[in-house]
Structures are given as C-alpha cells and as structure tokens.
Regions:
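Helix-loop-helix hairpin linking two adjacent transmembrane segments in secondary transporters
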Residues: 127, 159, 167-216
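A late C-terminal transmembrane helix in Major Facilitator Superfamily
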Residues: 368-404, 411
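Helix-to-loop junctions at the C-terminal end of transmembrane segments
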Residues: 91-103, 299-314, 399
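C-terminal transmembrane helical hairpin of 12-TM major facilitator-type secondary transporters
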Residues: 314-361
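Extracytoplasmic gate region of multi-pass secondary transporters
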Residues: 60, 249-290, 297
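Juxtamembrane intracellular "pre-TM" segments in multi-pass secondary transporters
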Residues: 26-36, 215-253
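Cytoplasmic helix-loop-helix junction between adjacent transmembrane helices
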Residues: 134-172
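Conserved MFS/SLC helix-loop-helix module at the cytosolic interface between two early adjacent transmembrane helices
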Residues: 90-125
Length: 431
C-alpha cells in the first residue's frame, strides 16, 4: 500500500475530536517510504525549509561588516536579533489556528514572500531597515516552518510516514544550520554580504511563486472535499481550546520550549566555557561547534528514522524520556568535567540527545493532533522561540551567580522539568 496521498489527512480530529492517545491509525501499519523516495517527494519543502534559515545566518556571519556599514555598532545589531525571536513568538501564537484553515502551500508562499522582502530590506544596510529585517525574518519563519512541516506530513496517509516526513524537514533545518555559514561565506568573497541577501531574496521569491502555483493546482479533483474539510474546522478560539484537550499536547509543547531554552542557553556559553576551561581559541573551537552541529543533525535524522519504523522497538514517549535523561547528564557533565577528551564526547551527546527529543516532539505532535497539526506545530514553534529568548538569559544568570556550575544548575533544572513533563506525556498515552 502506498504511503502517499495528495489530500490532507482526515481523522476524527478534523472536527475537533481527539484521537485516543497511543492508538494507532487504521493505516498505521502501512509501508513507510524510504528516505530517498521521501526526499524526491519532499525536496521543494526541504529546500524552502533550508532557505528560511539563511537570512539570519548571513546576518550573524557578517555582523561586524554589517554593523560598520549601518553605523549602529555590533552590540546594537546583536540586540536587534532578539526582535526576530519576539516577532516569531507573537506571530506564531496569533496565527497558529490559521495554518489549518488555509492551504499549507499558500501559508508557505506567504512566509517565503515575507522572507524575500526582509532580505531585500536587509541588503540596504540601513539601521532602521535592518531592524525591520529582523522583525520580518522572525515573522516569516513563524509561518513558514510549521506550514512546511504540516504540509510534508499531509503528503502521507499513515502516522509513521507522516511523522518521518515532518522529521525530515527538521533534519534539513539542522543540516542547513551546520553548513550554511561556509556556504554563505564563499559566495560573499565574490559579491559581499549584500549579494548573499539579494540571492536569498531571489530564491525565496521563486519558491513563493512555486508554492502559490502548487496551491492553485490543488483546485482540481478532490478540491471540494478539501474545502469541505476546511469549512468543518473549528473557529479561531475553539482551535486553541481543542488543542488543549488533546492528550499530552500541552506537555509536549512545554517540553519543546524547556528543551530549547536549555540547549540554546548551553550553546550561548559553550565557547566561553571551552576558552576558560581548556584555553580553546575561536579557531580550534570551530571544530567543537562542528562536532555539536553534526551530532544534532545525526540525532535528528536517525531518531526520525527509528520512530518511523513499521515495528518501532521503542515508543516516541519512551525515547523522548530516555533522551532527556541523557541530555541532562551530559549537559551537567560538560560544565563539571576538567578533561577536554571527556568534554568532547559529552558535547556530542548533548547535541544528539536534544535532537532526539526534538524529533520525538515533532513526531508525537503530528501523530496526536490530526488535522490540528498545523496549529500544534505553530504553537510549538512559538514556544521554542520563547525558549530561545529565555535560554541565554537564564544561563547568564546562573553564570553570574555561580560560574559555570551555576549555568549547569540553571539549564539542568530546565531539562529536569522537561523530563517530568515527558513522563506526563507518556502517562497520557496509556490513559
């Protein structure tokens, strides 16, 4: 039986009725396509997902020359980046129910159009327009990422394949985060950072047109059934209420938020830790950063593959709990170890464990939320944006109060709370 479908998945949740937690869908035993076949089907979604990460990568990579050009100073431009997180939180929360009420392709096209406009504004180098750039990038990705993830999941008619499709999108994002810096630095040798932004503006414009036309092509056979399904969707406020009644969904969103806060807080001070503890300069530390990024990508990729197996040896709830235990132990271990050769594998473990948790959250949200998955993924993305915003602050507070041991305590505490909530999610699957 083929796992692909051209219509959005339908379930009891299309009318707001939650599926019994832990219950398999009628076709959950269907064959899950291989990664290569999925990639051939989903490459436009994966490319758009990768493109969404590039604007801020250019901004971070060339922060010093951009600051010189704008006259705003490095510190001021660094603070502008926080505007993107706040915009993502606000837009993601406000528009979450709308992701399920419009065609996913059109939502993705809108997000890409906003990113194209933001890149064009950023290329000006003007301080105020750079502030607008940061706001628009945050807003655009808040719409783009959940729309792409939900659209990829909707291409398949069984839970295992839908979850795998969603995690392939997130794996693409982690791979892009790993490779984007050198990929934007090399072309910049020819056309500068402005050329990078104009190039991403052009790419996002082309992709926006592609998804717009793709959405229009769906107005053929089956469009009436899809329109009827959209008409049967709950209202704006009702979507939030129904999402809260689905078993384990709210704890899952909180797990994602806390995990993100802990991981981003850890990354914010990792370079300072390796410099103070082991005397690693920025050059050698780049290898540590690559190790962490590679571990995150591989953890996300293989966790998604494990969860999509036809006969998974471990449930998503149990794997998430185990990964949080590993993440907690490894994170605390990194900040307390005095050996570089012990710190390096612990750093890799932190990245792989957090990536596994991220894959589990995405998979479980896709499986549990049915036709409300777009709303759920958007709320989840907003929560993660809030986690990014809070993580560095909490890690810094711990550092100020107790050195790196204080940072370990603050971020480890967040992970511990996430672990408790993961057990709540696991219990909800058996209720």
């Amino acid at each position: 039986m083929s796992g692909e479908t051209n219509a959005p998945a339908t379930s009891a949740q299309a009318t707001g009725q939650p599926r019994t937690a832990g219950a398999a869908s009628p076709d959950s035993a269907a064959t899950v396509p291989g990664d290569l076949r999925m990639t051939r089907l989903l490459w436009p979604f994966m490319l758009a997902s990768a493109a969404g990460l590039v604007p801020f990568t250019v901004y971070s990579t060339f922060l010093v020359p951009i600051a010189d050009e704008s006259g705003g100073g490095v510190a001021a431009l660094g603070q502008l980046r926080g505007l993107g997180g706040l915009a993502a939180l606000a837009v993601g929360s406000a528009l979450a129910p709308l992701i399920d009420r419009v065609r996913r392709e059109w939502a993705a096209a809108a997000g890409l159009a906003v990113l194209a406009a933001s890149a064009a504004l950023g290329a000006s180098g003007d301080f105020l327009l750079l502030a607008a750039f940061c706001l628009l990038v945050g807003a655009g990705t808040a719409v783009l990422n959940p729309a792409l993830t939900a659209a990829a999941a909707d291409r398949f008619d069984n839970d295992a394949a839908a979850g795998r499709a969603a995690t392939l999108i997130t794996a693409t994002q982690s791979l892009t985060a790993l490779l984007a810096a050198p990929l934007v630095a090399l072309p910049a040798l020819v056309w500068g950072w402005r050329g990078d932004l104009w190039a991403i503006a052009a790419l996002c414009s082309v992709l926006a047109l592609y998804f717009l036309l793709r959405g229009r092509r769906k107005a053929g056979p089956g469009a009436e059934a899809e329109a009827a399904g959209k008409a049967g969707q709950p209202g704006y406020v009702e979507s939030f209420r129904l999402l809260g009644t689905l078993p384990g969904v709210l704890p899952l969103v909180l797990v994602a938020m806390l995990r993100t806060a802990a991981f981003m807080g850890y990354l914010a001070y990792l370079a300072a830790f390796y410099d103070e503890r082991f005397g690693l300069a920025p050059g050698p530390f780049a290898m540590v950063w690559t190790l962490s990024g590679t571990s995150f990508f591989l953890g996300n990729l293989f966790a998604g593959r494990l969860l999509s197996a036809e006969r998974a040896r471990i449930s998503g709830e149990r794997l998430m709990t185990l990964a949080l235990v590993v993440a907690l132990a490894a994170l605390v271990g990194v900040f307390f170890t005095r050996s570089l050769w012990l710190s390096l594998p612990l750093t890799a473990l932190v990245g792989a464990a957090h990536a596994t948790v991220a894959a589990c959250v995405t998979t479980l949200l896709v499986r549990r939320c049915g036709s409300l998955r777009g709303t759920a993924l958007s709320v989840n993305a907003a929560g993660m944006s809030f986690g990014v915003f809070c993580g560095a602050g909490l890690g810094g507070a711990g550092l100020a109060l107790g050195g790196f041991a204080g940072t370990a305590a603050a971020l480890g505490g967040l992970t511990l709370v996430a672990l408790v909530l993961a057990r709540v999610v696991a219990r909800s699957s058996t209720d």
